[in-house]
Every structure is written in C-alpha cells, then in structure tokens.
Amino acid sequence: MAPTEPWSPSPGSAPWDYSGLDGLEELELCPAGDLPYGYVYIPALYLAAFAVGLLGNAFVVWLLAGRRGPRRLVDTFVLHLAAADLGFVLTLPLWAAAAALGGRWPFGDGLCKLSSFALAGTRCAGALLLAGMSVDRYLAVVKLLEARPLRTPRCALASCCGVWAVALLAGLPSLVYRGLQPLPGGQDSQCGEEPSHAFQGLSLLLLLLTFVLPLVVTLFCYCRISRRLRRPPHVGRARRNSLRIIFAIESTFVGSWLPFSALRAVFHLARLGALPLPCPLLLALRWGLTIATCLAFVNSCANPLIYLLLDRSFRARALDGACGRTGRLARRISSASSLSRDDSSVFRCRAQAANTASASW
C-alpha cells in the first residue's frame, strides 16, 4: 500500500482521506502504515467468528423459534438477540475478503452499502436488546408487583419490534454515506465513508443513542438489582444464577464494544476538527481501531458460548439436539445453576418443564 493511502480495511473504520474537511487538510500527509501481517490474522479472525457465530446463533434461533407452548419473556429477547448476531456474522466473510486484499472491496457498491447497513443496524439492535433484558431483570427483581402489567409476552414482543425499528433507522446513514471510495492510483476501490461533516456529526449522535444510552440504562438497572440482592428477603439461588448469566452477556458486550466506541468517538472528533491530533497519535488511533474492530466482531459469537459454559440445561439440550436423543439426559441434570428454573429461563426443554415445578417470570 502507498504510505498515504486512505484507509478503510474494516467496516468499523473510515478512510483516512481528509480532503474537503476544513482545518484537516494537513493530516493527509500523515503516514498510513498497516498493522504487521494484518492481512493474514484479521481475515482468519473474522472467518473464525463467522463460523462459530453462524453455528451458535443459528442453533439458538432454532431452539427458541421451534419451541412449542408459551414462551417466557426473556426467551423473546434472547431469540431476537441471536437473530441480530446472526445477521451480523453473515457479513463477516465479505469484510474478511476485503481485509485479505488490503482494503480493496471487490463486491460492488450495492454490497458495500448493504453490509454496512446490516452491521450498523444489528449492532444497534444488540445494544438495545441487552438494555431491554436489563430492564426486564430490574422489573422482575426490584419492581416485581408494580411491573406485572408491563411484563407480558405482548409487551416483550412490542419492545423487540420497537428495537428493530430503531435499528433500521440507525442503519440508514450507512446506506447514504457509505460506498465505494477510490484507492490511490484510481484502479481499485474500498468500502468506506464519504468525508462529510454531516456524517461525522450524525455518527457521534448515533454512538450516543445506540451505545452510551443503553450502557447507562444497563448500569442503572444492575446497580439497583445489586442493592436489592443485599437486602432481605433474599432472592433465591435460581434467580441469582440467571442474573449471573445475563450479567456475563452484558459484560462481554460492553468489554467488546467499549474500546471500539471510544476510539470511534475520538476518530469522529478528529475528522470534525474538534480534536486535532499529530501524526503519531493518528497512526496509533488507526491501529487501535483495527484491533478494536476485531474485538467487537468476536462478540457476535460469544453469547452461545456463554450459554454453553454457564447454563447446564442449555448444554443438555444442545447435546440432545446434536445427538438426536429424547431428552432423558436433560431430565437427569439439575437446573440449579442455569436459567431454567427461574422466570428468566431461556433454555428449559419440554421434558424438564413436565417434571420441574415452573417458576413465574
């Protein structure tokens, strides 16, 4: 690559082409060195996340969508969360190919816009759905009696539909401002952003609404839940375990997306001219965004692994589904350390439901 080449090897990054932005023209002279061997390990990481995320999230969707009988509230959120992660990972092979080609996008302008739209929308949906799960846990633990009219399957489904509507709106700027941008030499193109003040400001606003705000809501809910758990009457062991699983999901999401979101905010401020940065810091920001993008993308395959590691009932059901067994194994496994006996159950199979006293949501 040329040393001053615009940069957009990943969908979470924007090209380092500052032409047309007042006060930032001097940054065009900054060198644009790539991470050593990034064209090797970044595609490999993306493809690994694609394989694990596709299998894991497709299994969760199959498990919950094919379940007969009434569905508990958290099942609705988990089903939509798995669908969002599934939509996210389906775009990863495209970005893996682009990364392997040094940022060159061989799939045309339409797929550039569509895949960018899918990433933005599913990322927003995931953040809002996790915030919805936190609010549901808050209502179940802290406001159990007062929240009964709100904690119904219809309200949960309406909340998820509202999340998807917001996610579609959040993805629209990608359809407008992202597309093929020329690489130096004019023969190849990359999938990147137009150098527009409007898009940078809009991206900052969306970052606030689709990451910072859900994060604040989540932290508030878990702080209140933590206070409630320390007061008598104490919450039962099953509910504590279900909270532990959901907290692990939330923590993984925040740990994966917080570095990316923070660096993206700095990047947008730099492009707006509000935060002038010297060339060494710009290069560090570029490398940091590349690494943070990889970390964020890996999150799309994390939730099924969390269910597998922390939920014994899910492990039994997964084994039954993989081996074609009848469910006798699931009946023999205690659900004391899973979500299944609490109202936050996600993966109780029908055999367990017939033999275990069900707890209300």
Swiss-Prot record:
Q: Which residues lie on this side of the membrane: Extracellular?
A: 1-39, 97-126, 177-200, 264-289
Asked if the record carries the keyword Membrane, the reply is yes
Q: Which GO terms describe its cellular component?
A: plasma membrane
- Major place of localization? membrane
Q: Topology in the membrane?
A: Multi-pass membrane protein
Keywords, comma-separated and alphabetical:
Cell membrane, G-protein coupled receptor, Membrane, Receptor, Transducer, Transmembrane, Transmembrane helix
SUPFAM superfamilies from the entry?
Answer: Family A G protein-coupled receptor-like (SSF81321)
Q: Which residues cross the membrane?
A: 40-60, 76-96, 127-147, 156-176, 201-220, 243-263, 290-310
Q: Which residues form the signal peptide?
A: none
Topology check: give the Cytoplasmic ranges: 61-75, 148-155, 221-242, 311-361
- Family membership noted in the UniProt record: Belongs to the G-protein coupled receptor 1 family.
What's the name of the protein?
Answer: Probable G-protein coupled receptor 25
* UniProt organism field: Homo sapiens
